[in-house]
Curated annotation (Swiss-Prot):
Taxonomic source organism: Syntrophomonas wolfei subsp. wolfei (strain DSM 2245B / Goettingen)
Keywords: Cell cycle, Cell division, Cytoplasm, Septation
Keyword Hydrolase: no
Signal peptide as annotated in the record: none
Record's protein name: Cell division protein SepF
Length: 142
């Protein structure tokens, strides 16, 4: 589980049963613009939320789907969920993600990320982790 702990730290998320985190992006400021330039500021006042959840039953899928509809990212950990329940939840949330034109990817054996359409997932996560120093932190298999 050491590699996943590194991934969680890289994502800036501490492992908890359910955790919502607000990431504040810096707002545009006139003070940042000194003199005439051709640079256009792309900062916005939007906040993005990441919901980390360890679902225990299929009854939670509506709440999870509502998070996606609200444009929140979901990280689902199925380590303590029965396999048949996990598969049903993954199927439901995958359908929700598809209908919202979102994205999904498996991060680990039982860990998945689902994002709304405004958030893309880098497909080559291993090279990103190597770039940021998180690949193979404990000397295990590459």
């Amino acid at each position: 589980m050491g590699v996943m702990d590194g991934l969680w730290r890289w994502l800036g998320v501490e492992r908890e049963e359910v955790r919502e985190e607000i990431i504040e992006l810096p707002a545009y400021s006139e003070e940042n613009q000194r003199g005439p330039t051709n640079v256009v500021s792309i900062h916005s006042n939007k906040t993005f939320k990441v919901v980390v959840c360890e679902p225990e039953s299929f009854d939670e899928v509506q709440v999870l789907a509502d998070h996606l509809k609200s444009r929140k990212q979901l990280i689902l950990n199925f380590d303590n969920t029965p396999p048949e329940v996990s598969q049903r939840i993954i199927d439901f949330i995958s359908g929700t993600t598809y209908s919202l034109e979102g994205h999904s990817q498996q991060l680990g054996k039982n860990i998945f990320i689902f994002t709304p359409s405004n958030v893309e997932i880098a497909k080559d996560h291993r090279s990103l982790m190597r770039k940021h120093g998180f690949a193979n932190p404990f000397g295990g298999e590459k």
